[in-house]
From Swiss-Prot:
Membrane topology of the entry: Multi-pass membrane protein
UniProt KW Protease keyword: no
Encoding gene per record: yqeD
GO cellular component, one term: plasma membrane
Cellular compartment(s): Cell membrane
Main subcellular location of this protein, as a coarse class: membrane
Keywords: Cell membrane, Membrane, Transmembrane, Transmembrane helix
Presence of the UniProt keyword Nuclease in the record: no
Name of the protein this chain belongs to: Uncharacterized protein YqeD
Length: 208
């Protein structure tokens, strides 16, 4: 019971602060400096739980304020903070409730079976290809038998290409929208072709 209460309070705090203070947070990030780095990481972490601000906007803002290289590691750090926190909340605070919800959707249970069978590859490819929403993947992995360190490193590696592409594409969006769309579209196309050629079985949902 205590774990559930703590989990609920954490989620409410993250969403409330992020939602009601998002404009102030964005202004703080634009100001630059050490505190703006912290604000950016916390806002991205909150965004994992609830899309307070479009992820691409935060990534682009980080690139513009801190530079592409710094923007990438700041965005990645914030994203991983939110990701691992949600994973642990799903595993230890809301496991029973979330399990009942997942059981109502056979397709999601099939994906969970894939995570249990080949955890690192499944999580890695799930990050590279956003077939499953990130929030849903975090919860499913928290409910599954995936070890936290496997989930962490697979997510870390899998998030890097997307964050790099989104940061670069987002930073150029105002000056060249076509270029930004082309960069991200090409990235998605390449990944899809790799999966189709090398891992076609991972595109199929197992039948019961």
């Amino acid at each position: 019971m205590l774990k559930k209460v703590i989990g609920i309070l954490v989620i409410i705090a993250i969403i409330s602060v992020g939602f009601f203070q998002k404009e102030a947070w964005l202004d703080a990030i634009k100001a630059g400096g050490m505190f703006s780095v912290l604000f950016s990481m916390l806002l991205i972490a909150a965004d994992v739980f609830f899309p307070i601000v479009p992820f691409a906007l935060i990534a682009a803002l980080n690139g513009a304020v801190f530079g592409t290289a710094n923007g990438i590691w700041i965005t990645l750090t914030g994203s991983m903070l939110g990701t691992i926190l949600l994973f642990f909340l799903a595993r230890y605070s809301f496991r029973d409730w979330a399990r009942k919800k997942v059981q109502a959707y056979p397709a999601i249970q099939s994906y969970e079976a894939s995570f249990n069978k080949n955890a690192f590859t499944a999580v890695l490819l799930g990050r590279l290809i956003p077939v499953i929403p990130s929030l849903v993947m975090n919860v499913i992995c928290g409910l599954s038998q995936v070890r936290w360190h496997v989930f962490f490193f697979a997510s870390l590696i899998g998030k890097i290409p997307n964050i790099v592409v989104v940061t670069i594409a987002g930073a150029n969006f105002t000056s060249n929208k076509l270029l930004s769309i082309s960069i991200y579209g090409t990235y998605i196309l390449i990944i899809m072709l790799v999966i189709y050629k090398k891992f076609p079985h991972l595109l199929k949902v197992p039948k019961k």
